[in-house]
Amino acid sequence: MEIIFYHPFFDAAQWIQGMQQRLPNINIRQWKRGDNKHADYAMVWAPPYEMLANRSGLKGIFILGAGVEAILKQEQQKPGMLPAGVPLMRLEDAGMGLQMQEYAVAMVLHYLRRMDEYKLQQGQRRWKQLEPYDRKDFVVGVLGAGVLGRRVAQTLVEWGFIVRCWSRTPKQINNVVSFHGEDQLGDFLSGSKVLINLLPDTPKTRGILNLSLFSQLKPKSYLINIARGAHLVEHDLLVAIDKGYIVGASLDVFVEEPLPEMHPFWTHPRITVTPHVAAITIPDIAMDTISENIRRIEKGELSTGVVDIKLGY
């Protein structure tokens, strides 16, 4: 069995050694330009066009992350990059779920206990105790009910929060009020004090975090974006803060990364910036997931994380 590996930043030697330990009967090599030799599987992130185009014999392509928008954009720009009929698989969790849970809980608690405002007071050398929020009014809304969205919602329930969730199609999550479809988006927003975005990046979801949406939230709400930067209309967030629709935002993803040095988000007193760290790929867990999927495919069983290319996730 032959596997080709490509990632512009990861340590290829670490991944090659790790995969060989998990699947002793494979041959895995780092793909380099001009390598047109046979491969059964490809493990990739942002691969060059010629790595996959016109390659026959592939049984599966594994994306080394949870998002697939980058490779789908490549396919859109240069049709034929992805071999027809070959399953494209993403990492549904691979340790990212726990990281997302930690980040979301940390930021929700940050706002519940009004730590953002105490930080502002500290800069003013001002000693004033603020009235705590009533939890029954501090409703958390999760946009997106995929694997990561469900895990975040369930964790917040365990922390005692009232949680609601919105998704494109109906989803049921224990102790979470579920909404779905465009018709129910307004009702979902109107009851949310904290909005956590975990939607996939698709043409339909890009720009969804805009002034119109912010105006439908509970007054003086909070935004936590841990999905993709393309979801947020950045200027609209600044306007929403000026208008009082949003009083605090935690942003981990941006339209341009790294965030430009002169970007207004860096110095805005009501915006917290983190450098795309809410959930990162953990090599050992990712390799366990990919190895198990290869075993399943070789046995004729269904694999996990298969992407619906038409839907974009």
UniProtKB/Swiss-Prot annotation:
Family to which this protein belongs: Belongs to the D-isomer specific 2-hydroxyacid dehydrogenase family. GhrA subfamily.
Record-given protein name: Glyoxylate/hydroxypyruvate reductase A
Primary localisation category: cytoplasm
Organism: Photorhabdus laumondii subsp. laumondii (strain DSM 15139 / CIP 105565 / TT01) (Photorhabdus luminescens subsp. laumondii)
A Pfam family matched in the record: 2-Hacid_dh_C
EC number from the UniProt entry: 1.1.1.79, 1.1.1.81
Record: active site: 228, 276 (proton donor)
Gene that encodes the chain: ghrA
Catalytic reaction list: glycolate + NADP(+) = glyoxylate + NADPH + H(+); (R)-glycerate + NAD(+) = 3-hydroxypyruvate + NADH + H(+); (R)-glycerate + NADP(+) = 3-hydroxypyruvate + NADPH + H(+)
SUPFAM superfamilies assigned: NAD(P)-binding Rossmann-fold domains
Keywords: Cytoplasm, NAD, NADP, Oxidoreductase
Compartments (UniProt record): Cytoplasm
Described purpose of this protein according to its UniProt entry: Catalyzes the NADPH-dependent reduction of glyoxylate and hydroxypyruvate into glycolate and glycerate, respectively.
GO MF entries: glyoxylate reductase (NADPH) activity; hydroxypyruvate reductase (NADH) activity; hydroxypyruvate reductase (NADPH) activity; NAD binding
GO cellular component: cytoplasm
